[in-house]
């Protein structure tokens, strides 16, 4: 089964930041990968929240240098919201893949089996997250854009400039 590739076109402080291309592990975590892919395309329409199930226009709301950049809350925009294509939350699929270094794509959660739409991209190796967060892909192009977003972060995670997913979708 070929791995799916998706993209984010990023703006940083209202200016073009570049493109991040990610490969999804649809062969290892199909449910998690499909959730992310469909949230990139927006093809599922509106969710239970009444908001479109789509990352387009959402922000990286939590950016911690030398750790990760977190986004995917398209309902509230502050880390308290988001929802999956499978309903509000869904279970951890498996923990086969690990947080091995920069570019790892993983699900953000608030405990076991609470996956929604929030995700993070690691900027360093984060082994303490293994077995707690489902890794479902990796950056294959645009780590420079990830680093540019990371540079707008702070110790408490508050961004110094808006880092927005201006457009997103599936690579064909």
Curated annotation (Swiss-Prot):
Cellular component, GO annotation: cytoplasm
InterPro entries: Cyclophilin-like_dom_sf, Cyclophilin-type_PPIase, Cyclophilin-type_PPIase_CS, Cyclophilin-type_PPIase_dom
UniProt keywords, alphabetically: Isomerase, Rotamase
EC number: 5.2.1.8
Lineage: superkingdom: Eukaryota
Catalytic activity of the protein: [protein]-peptidylproline (omega=180) = [protein]-peptidylproline (omega=0)
GO MF annotations in UniProt: cyclosporin A binding; peptidyl-prolyl cis-trans isomerase activity
Statement: the UniProt record of this protein carries the keyword Isomerase: yes
Keyword presence, Isomerase: yes
GO BP terms, alphabetized: protein folding
One Pfam family of this chain: Pro_isomerase
Residue stretches making up the PPIase cyclophilin-type domain: 7-170
Family: Belongs to the cyclophilin-type PPIase family.
Function: PPIases accelerate the folding of proteins. It catalyzes the cis-trans isomerization of proline imidic peptide bonds in oligopeptides.
PANTHER family with a match to the protein in the record: PEPTIDYL-PROLYL CIS-TRANS ISOMERASE, PEPTIDYL-PROLYL CIS-TRANS ISOMERASE 2
Protein name: Peptidyl-prolyl cis-trans isomerase 2
Annotated gene: cyn-2
């Amino acid at each position: 089964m070929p791995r799916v590739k998706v993209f984010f076109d990023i703006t940083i402080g209202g200016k073009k930041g570049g493109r991040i291309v990610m490969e999804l592990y649809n062969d290892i975590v199909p449910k998690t990968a499909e959730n992310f892919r469909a949230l990139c395309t927006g093809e599922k329409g509106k969710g239970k929240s009444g908001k479109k199930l789509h990352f387009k226009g959402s922000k990286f709301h939590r950016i911690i240098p030398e750790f990760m950049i977190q986004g995917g809350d398209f309902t509230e925009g502050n880390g308290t919201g988001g929802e999956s294509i499978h309903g509000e939350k869904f279970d951890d699929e498996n923990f086969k893949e690990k947080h091995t270094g920069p570019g790892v794509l993983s699900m953000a959660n608030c405990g076991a089996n609470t996956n929604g739409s929030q995700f993070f991209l690691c900027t360093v190796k984060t082994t303490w997250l293994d077995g707690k967060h489902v890794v479902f892909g990796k950056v294959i192009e645009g780590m420079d854009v990830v680093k540019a977003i990371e540079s707008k972060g702070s110790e408490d995670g508050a961004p110094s400039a808006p880092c927005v997913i201006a457009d997103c979708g599936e690579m064909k």
